[in-house]
Amino acid sequence: MDKNTLVGFVLIGAVLIGFSIYNRPSQEEMERAQRYQDSIQTIALQEAAKQAEAAAQSTQALTLDSTSLFFGANQGTEQFTTLENNLVKVTFSNKGGRVVSATLKDYNNQQGEPLTLFNEEESALNFAFEGKNENILTEDLFFQPMNVTDSTITMRLQTIGAGYIDFAYRLLPESYLVNFDIRAVGMQNFFPAAQKTVNIDWSQLARQQEKGFDFEQRYTSLTYKPADDGSDYLSEMKDDKESFEEPMQWIAFKNQFFSSVLIANQNFDDVTLESKLQKEGSGYMKDYNAEMTTFFDPTGKEATQLQMYLGPNHFKTLLATNDLVINQDEDPELEDLVYLGWPIVRQINRWFTINLFDWLSGWGLNMGIVLLLMTIIVKIIVYPATRKSY
């Protein structure tokens, strides 16, 4: 190493040492920085302690507050009860007092098993009752099954006193319709005098039932029926969310060939609907959610009357179900869940295509095969006219 190089290294080293000494913080600055760091850690610890305390208090309020009117319903063991007729098997859980699955006996899935619309993990139904001093959220409370028969069950949410709320279900014979009444008994002092509604939060993942994802996606939609208008639906091809001022007669979580429909005798108000697309391969088409209110009488003199249709989008079946809907002030028009096209085409579809569909599906064929055969038959019928046009 020559002399110039050595001198260069020495100078560089001297500059670095001098720069580090010059920029070194003073003792006072280091103490101030340490105090700042300590204060940051103290604040973080205090905040964490507050959050832990709040969580503990929340849990304690849920599980240990013996002053709650529903203290005894906070804990329990989940049990299931099944109602069935010749068409559908509906399973209920005492947790939340709700329907947790529906299986259609006359339809099979891709594995050849009875087709299930949804199960407990794929659906939720929560009722929120606003009280004077506490609110009731039914989804996490345990009900007591009462009056169980082959076609009826009453889920009772018992207070620590004599009052209770009943969810009374009745599966109608030879039908996909479940009548659902809600009634409060002996709870006038729990609710505010002005309380006239109950909040409902309903959600469901729409299963992929057919092999063709894109085609099924296109005909899977969250459909709704305003009380004074025809039915409509959210977008089938993108995420969509809408809020409505007008009352709704029913809301349907519709798949291509099957639907879960919630119908209100006293209509739904303050409705917000949301539909989210699901990815191919997930096993689901869409994630549905509906938030709304409906009539509720805290005195128990009048029941909240709901109905659930859990079945196929079969035109004649839906048409017959219209007559079983309690609210007949307006035509329920459940058959609109089957899209028949524009007015002229609609008549052809109603009187020819639907009968052809019923005949083919009566052979127990997969829906995809039924549609393929229908396409071939229709093309054969229109072939002579099509050939002449060329």
Model-derived features with residue positions:
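Membrane-interface amphipathic helices and adjacent TM-edge segments
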Residues: 163, 299, 377-390
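Subset of Sec-pathway N-terminal targeting signals
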Residues: 1-50
